[in-house]
Amino acid sequence: MNTIHYNETVQLQPCVATIGFFDGVHRGHQFLIRHLVETASQENLQSTIITFDEHPRKVLQSDYQPEMLSTLDSKLLLLSKTEVDNAVVLHFDKAMAAMSACEFMQKILHDHLHVRKLFIGYDHRFGHNRSETFGDYVRYGKELGIEVIKNDAFRIDDINISSSVIRSFLKEGEIELSLIHISEPTRPY
């Protein structure tokens, strides 16, 4: 896996991508990553995960200190054990937070990362104040030549697996439950 710390000179080969913080690279993330890799292979494109160096809420709410499931280095190590071609790390700051979803898709996803298909997690939102919807992303994507696809939730025992759910299990002392949701016993990632 190529790890790329994004700047305005970065130019990737056309790719299928997904975007998110990927804290813990848990089973929900792994489910999304498998779809990403399979689709990229079928389309003969590179697979790319776009993530951030800082949790967006930490930047936007200076008093927010999330208990993270992984550091950036450990997240990249976990991602390197998947079949993903590229991991692009964006520096999340106030300037990026001020970008609309349309501007983000144009300047970063289209102009520099050359995204052809974008997988979005079932609960993921991006752009200034996260005010835009999946329908907006689809509309912007059509204008830019990016197909936007919403990935279904990965569920175990009627629970949508997310980093927040795993954090709550850990907080409640449910170590075994959190481990079940973090990784599959038969997979190294």
Regions found by a protein language model. Give the residues of each.
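Short acidic-hydrophobic, aromatic-tinged amphipathic segments that line or gate anion-handling sites
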Residues: 2-8
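N-terminal Rossmann-like or analogous alpha/beta NTP/dinucleotide-binding catalytic cores
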Residues: 58-144
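A short, charged helix-loop
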Residues: 143-154, 161
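Single conserved hydrophobic/aromatic residue that forms the stacking wall/gate
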Residues: 180-189
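N-terminal catalytic cores of NTP/NDP-binding nucleotidyl/phosphoryl-transfer enzymes
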Residues: 8-71
